[in-house]
Amino acid sequence: MKDLLKFLKAQTKTEEFDAIKIALASPDMIRSWSFGEVKKPETINYRTFKPERDGLFCARIFGPVKDYECLCGKYKRLKHRGVICEKCGVEVTQTKVRRERMGHIELASPTAHIWFLKSLPSRIGLLLDMPLRDIERVLYFESYVVIEGGMTNLERSQILTEEQYLDALEEFGDEFDAKMGAEAIQALLKSMDLEAECEQLREELNETNSETKRKKLTKRIKLLEAFVQSGNKPEWMILTVLPVLPPDLRPLVPLDGGRFATSDLNDLYRRVINRNNRLKRLLDLAAPDIIVRNEKRMLQEAVDALLDNGRRGRAITGSNKRPLKSLADMIKGKQGRFRQNLLGKRVDYSGRSVITVGPYLRLHQCGLPKKMALELFKPFIYGKLELRGLATTIKAAKKMVEREEAVVWDILDEVIREHPVLLNRAPTLHRLGIQAFEPVLIEGKAIQLHPLVCAAYNADFDGDQMAVHVPLTLEAQLEARALMMSTNNILSPANGEPIIVPSQDVVLGLYYMTRDKINAKGEGMVLTGPKEAERLYRSGQAELHARVKVRITEYEKDANGEFVAKTSLIDTTVGRAILWMIVPKGLPFSIVNQPLGKKAISKMLNTCYRILGLKPTVIFADQTMYTGFAYAARSGASVGIDDMVIPAKKAEIIAEAEAEVAEIQEQFQSGLVTAGERYNKVIDIWAAANDRVSKAMMDNLQTETVINRNGEEEQQVSFNSIYMMADSGARGSAAQIRQLAGMRGLMAKPDGSIIETPITANFREGLNVLQYFISTHGARKGLADTALKTANSGYLTRRLVDVAQDLVVTEDDCGTLEGITMTPVIEGGDVKEPLRDRVLGRVTAEDVLKPGTADILVARNTLLNEQWCDILEANSVDSVKVRSVVTCDTDFGVCAHCYGRDLARGHIINKGEAIGVIAAQSIGEPGTQLTMRTFHIGGAASRAAAESSIQVKNKGSIRLSNAKSVVNSSGKLVVTSRNTELKLIDEFGRTKESYKVPYGAVMAKGDGEQVAGGETVANWDPHTMPVITEVAGYIRFTDMIDGQTITRQTDELTGLSSLVVLDSAERTAGGKDLRPALKIVDANGNDVLIPGTDMPAQYFLPGKAIVQLEDGVQISSGDTLARIPQESGGTKDITGGLPRVADLFEARRPKEPAILAEVAGIVSFGKETKGKRRLVITPVDGGDAYEEMIPKWRQLNVFEGERVERGDVISDGPEAPHDILRLRGVQAVTRYIVNEVQDVYRLQGVKINDKHIEVIVRQMLRKATIMDAGSSEFLEGEQVEYSRVKIANRELEANGKVSATYMRDLLGITKASLATESFISAASFQETTRVLTEAAVAGKRDELRGLKENVIVGRLIPAGTGYAYHQDRMRRRAAGELPAAPQVTAEDASASLAELLNAGLGGNDNE
């Protein structure tokens, strides 16, 4: 037996390899793979079912059909191994060689490989510098191509039609050489001198100035260099020998009834062989040219169809009218080789069943049905039975198990003990979708699942199924226990909060037992401790909610980690005292001394984890669950129709609203308001009414009046069941209660617009037919949305995983000083996310100073944990520069310091953690909770009134950043800068609120002044944009000619007149070139200069501007010279939810992006064209002016003569991330993408750590474009991996050479996935054909750095425990050690095996 094992070990020899190279196969190489030429199209003999000789299934070429048996049956058995039968020519060996032996077909005429021809950009076309159309005409025998011009005036690779060719033949005779078909193309490719061509192109590149030409030349140079470096020959793109796939990979299977099922490839091969043989015959017969030509064309088409059916012309179809599946189709798509068989395989030792609740299980257990366990652990049971001597052979053991003898169950118990199993629920959206549990054997057929892990699986018990997998090897069991056990996954990797959190019943139970009630039985008692409290409650002496005093002993950890006891009498309730019994030592009593809602319970577990660690938390979580269930059952909380209390005020509120609507209707009929205004007002009225009803309803539900001990009335929080469920966070929400007991409110039509008559009824009162009908639409839309959402969200996750899969933590510290500055997220008056939440678990990039001093508060490279964050908060620090993966300097992967804390474990991240995949899962998993729709601004959905002032909420001092302002005549400040920000700072120096202040706003308070809460600090007119003068003087009109550039309008009511500047479109011919402006002069008529510059103060007026001043009027600084009406922002759709996230990660340019200043300087306008104006920015320090054409309809934020900085907004709109990167740098674009993505998730209440989004951004910034190559081998304008530029520059600098300059590129995630260094990963993602073609031509090496590549080639992935294995391998190879080789040679092993087999299985074949 030992020898047998040795032999098997020797058989499965593992190849040690580090990279995989892909290249073009030369004809000789194809022949060297082949075991013989396939000459006939026959497959198998229809009578004998034996393969035909020289056919597609020929046994002589591909190997025997039966193990160790030749075709004619002369040689059978192992002893003849390796003999070649002289009768039928078949080698006697295993039949599995039919899976690996290839054949070949010698093509009678060369044929082009369709991938290199048609996969755009066409490689053959690029190499020959001929249009694809022309090449196709040559290949398919429509025209000739000149191969050798000789002494004639014909160029090489010139295309000739039939007539031109005949004329040339007459003229020059055989001076020149022209051919058609693939031979011609092959000859052209063969005669190319790649190096010389390359030199010539490089010279051309240096001379040319045209952008398009440069692009084309660089493309050709890259291709030619790829050919030179990879050792591929261009003529190999034309096939002369066609390889034939091994027959077992394109099987022919007999069905019952004498029919055969065959792979489509056989049909395709048959066509090729038939046409090839016919062509050979025609050539032997010297048939007329036209016939041969036709046959060659047909051969070319047959080969095309075999390689990639349907790529050119119509796809070849089989008998059933469906296109045949070609070789290319075999590997691409979801059903192709990559995604179906290499990335996702079915596994053995697995089962699935329905899940039910296991409320009595411990957190690390799951209930496994005995039937399933018996089947899954069969091999272990057989082994144990044999080991114990209970069964003599495996066969006997098998019989015992089938009979289910009593002893088998005992053995099963033993086998299962301490052997974890994996439970998985599809869809596995993040890594918590597969966790390990210890199985507990149960009766029945359903798997029992612990209720607390349902949140991680997103499982419920309405018929969900789960799969069970058994880790077999010791290593697998170890990993399952140490890494995947449910008890080790308490925190969510997405945000670091507990994910093992009680929900629903448990929350309700805990909430109920921690509530207090006035005048409950037993109120005012003083108890000796929690035990007495429980005794009183059990014996009925006191109610759960009674307010009592209890003696409580708390334990606190001191500096040495010892517990210190502290006992005191505390006011609490009986229920809370009982709950205290399960709280672990070391937590304060205050944690349970409050009504516990879902949030409070989550916080409680989190605190427990941070203070006490993993084990106590797990035990605590389990105990909370048992307690919660028990007390939920005792509470008797149920839902009855009387719990839905309808507010008494409802009828009168609705009546009032109806009266208001009637009034608006009258105004509309008398023509005072437009139809649109009426609609909007009606909807506003109803939205307000709905809010009032729901407020009245909640007030009503929230409190109830009770009599206290002294007989007085007192208000207390209600014990209404529905209210308790919503308040505790167990089930339901205020919005749902509103529909039950308030009014349903406004509904939307299918197109998203709001129906102006609301549903005034609620579900308790019931809906009438019309109301019900209006409601059905929304319900159906919800279902349709969900279905779409799931698919879209899944696709987003797939793209994210693909772009980030090769990002792994590879070193401890890269030593970079870079980082990104974190500030709290403040929108308007509220802090959306405090600084603490953003920097927790990050590493500081520089010393954090105490505000206002030079003292170091936190040193550089400190991991900010909870304690450090408390220090930051105490010192009211409001910006911290932290390390970030985006700025990490590691070449491949990132370093632990730049990543910071591993969110799921709570300590700094380990090397080898696959942070890319974790990030992708964390962003993708909540994708299904995001909305799918784009919101139309319409109705009450989201109509914010145009803001016209800033009102602060808190008291504090004002700070204005990047503000310019002037003082107007009444002494107020007027803002004259564009992107001014107003921050409110409280007395500790913390930023509380932040607002944008528009140009022309009048400030009531200035920078640094104190304000009280509720004070208005700035106001402006939202409908017009003013032009404000910065200097005082007299107005002088220039180019303001009545009737040409301006018109005078008089208001009928007031009699005031104003001038309106005409748009250039409305002007007469004479006024086209005039530039109306207001100039400011002093009393003597000299120009006044703008302070701090030598520019005269003159303000050019755009079209539609309104001037209310006359020529020569005196004005003071800060006055409004003119007003430009703002068109209200139109009703732009806000893209929200999932599509918005996808747009951000795909880095799509918005429709009308903001126009940003490319350089810093002074703005002026050049000559206008028909629809555009010319913006010129002249740098202050001289240098070339930058020009840009801007469409006239864009509203500009700058006036002529204004100074702008690089990256300033010139015209409003959504900013394009590419512009932000180009003009403001990596930090700014990171901040933009992170904040925008977070906005979408925050709206849905989903918490994701910023890190994850930064990880994806890092991958989007993977490429750089070379601006100037320096001494490197890069080409100018070439797009290369950023890490490669960094490494190259480091080497160049070390050798004192000129390094390359580059610009970072932002790629969308799909683009970035396809642009990865690894062609295996890219090919398995999308566009398989294109990726493989490109890689083959370039002769690419895949270094197998990422996860995906390694999964595909079947190695351990370089992450987690596989990371150590790969590091070890590298180390051993560097040290020159060889992997331990098997001690036994193959010859010895096979000999001993033969002996064994012949001895043991000699006579009896009839087992």
Swiss-Prot record:
What residues does Zn(2+) 2 bind to?
Answer: C814, C888, C895, C898
Which residues are Mg(2+)-binding? Answer: D460, D462, D464
- Biological process (GO) annotations? DNA-templated transcription
User: Which reaction does this enzyme catalyse, per its entry?
Assistant: RNA(n) + a ribonucleoside 5'-triphosphate = RNA(n+1) + diphosphate
Task: Give a yes or no for keyword Magnesium in this entry.
Answer: yes
EC number annotated for this UniProt entry: 2.7.7.6
Q: How is the cofactor bound?
A: Binds 1 Mg(2+) ion per subunit. Binds 2 Zn(2+) ions per subunit.
- Cofactor (UniProt): Mg(2+); Zn(2+)
Q: Which UniProt keywords apply?
A: DNA-directed RNA polymerase, Magnesium, Metal-binding, Nucleotidyltransferase, Transcription, Transferase, Zinc
Please provide, alphabetically and separated by semicolons, the GO molecular function terms listed in this UniProt record: DNA binding; DNA-directed RNA polymerase activity; magnesium ion binding; zinc ion binding
Which cellular component terms (GO) are annotated to the entry?
DNA-directed RNA polymerase complex
For this protein, the record's HAMAP family field holds: RNApol_bact_RpoC
Similarity annotation: Belongs to the RNA polymerase beta' chain family.
* NCBIfam families listed in its UniProt record: rpoC_TIGR (TIGR02386)
Protein name as annotated:
DNA-directed RNA polymerase subunit beta'
Q: Which organism is it from?
A: Cronobacter sakazakii (strain ATCC BAA-894)
What lineage is this protein's organism placed in? Bacteria, Pseudomonadati, Pseudomonadota, Gammaproteobacteria, Enterobacterales
